[in-house]
């Protein structure tokens, strides 16, 4: 798959906050361009008029050959409390991610414009969701991200029932491995992703890996 020159500045031109550019809108063309060149949008919220496009100096990644499930969560998975589906309710997942309460954040970056753009990106086959459902068939948790060939860029996750988002994460990794994916871009490293083996690497190293493994989006 050939890649045209990006419409964005190079990630190595990011400022001290990891921002490479700002725009007043977000389109599928911009999303396709940014992910395949190591950049992602991170809006401040509905009240701001510009959308920052970011390439952090340090990047959170999960190399799938280093993935492991903590023993405590292995025991939780054996309870079989959830079932997993893929792409069964993408819009519901991204809206739930937007509504999730995050104590360490002042609000959600998933604005209505972001939801609209990613739902369209999903219809184009780039954005995918992994969902967990409880025994009653209710959506209990999930996550979504972008397929860039053998790289998968995770975006956001949520849970309504404890453990549901981690269950979705594990099922996502199992699915990605089956399709030959090498790494998940987690952007940042959280306690949850660190427990599965995520780590930080310099932006330049991430870009090198991305160029090596990026390709046509996968179909699940």
Where are these regions (language model features)?
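N-acyltransferase acceptor-side catalytic subdomain
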Residues: 1-220
């Amino acid at each position: 798959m050939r890649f045209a020159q990006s419409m964005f500045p190079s990630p190595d031109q990011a400022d001290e906050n990891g921002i490479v550019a700002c725009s007043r809108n977000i389109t599928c063309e911009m999303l396709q361009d940014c992910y395949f060149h190591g950049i992602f949008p991170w809006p401040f919220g509905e009240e701001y008029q510009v959308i920052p496009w970011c390439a952090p100096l340090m990047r959170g990644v999960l190399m799938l050959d280093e993935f492991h499930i903590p023993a405590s969560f292995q025991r939780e998975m054996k309870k079989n409390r959830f079932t997993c589906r893929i792409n069964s309710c993408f819009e519901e997942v991204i809206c739930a991610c937007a509504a999730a309460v995050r104590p360490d954040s002042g609000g959600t970056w998933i604005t209505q414009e972001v939801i609209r753009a990613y739902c369209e990106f999903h219809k184009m086959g780039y954005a995918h969701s992994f969902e967990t459902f409880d025994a009653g068939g209710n959506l209990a948790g999930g996550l979504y991200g972008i397929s860039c060939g053998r790289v998968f860029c995770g975006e956001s996750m949520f849970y309504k029932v404890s453990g549901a988002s981690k269950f979705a994460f594990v099922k996502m990794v199992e699915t990605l491995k089956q399709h030959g994916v090498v790494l998940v871009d987690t952007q940042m490293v959280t306690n949850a992703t660190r427990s599965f083996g995520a780590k930080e690497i310099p932006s330049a190293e991430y870009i090198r890996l991305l160029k090596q493994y990026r390709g046509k989006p996968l179909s699940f």
